[in-house]
From Swiss-Prot:
Superkingdom of origin organism: Bacteria
GO BP terms: translation
Pfam families: Ribosomal_S20p
Any GO molecular function: small ribosomal subunit rRNA binding
One GO CC term, this protein: small ribosomal subunit
Keywords, alphabetical: Ribonucleoprotein, Ribosomal protein, RNA-binding, rRNA-binding
Protein name: Small ribosomal subunit protein bS20
Underlying gene: rpsT
Compositional bias ranges of the Polar residues kind: 20-29
Length: 87
């Protein structure tokens, strides 16, 4: 239990930051799923458009250090490979 005023404030901030970061991670998962769904549907043009939007989302979340930059690179690489295999 936080005893000092500073510790109580940091605990409040941590709860708020955790909620925001969880939301951002959910956005990431949704973006990745959208690309995978478009690839499974076999629509290359739609998949390419969704892929570009997804890459933007992944990079933005990595820049905010919500996920590690290597994890972001791994996601982008695997999605790009799946998109390329569709051709």
């Amino acid at each position: 239990m936080a005893n000092t005023a500073q510790a109580r404030k940091r605990a409040r901030q941590a709860v708020k930051q955790n909620a925001h970061n969880s939301s951002q991670r959910s956005t990431l998962r949704t973006a990745v799923k959208a690309v995978r769904k478009a690839i499974e549907a076999g629509d290359k043009t739609a998949a390419a458009q969704v892929f570009l939007a997804s890459v933007s989302t992944i990079d933005r979340i990595a820049d905010k250090k919500i996920i590690h930059k290597n994890k972001a690179a791994r996601h982008k690489s695997r999605l790009a490979a799946a998109l390329k295999a569709l051709a």
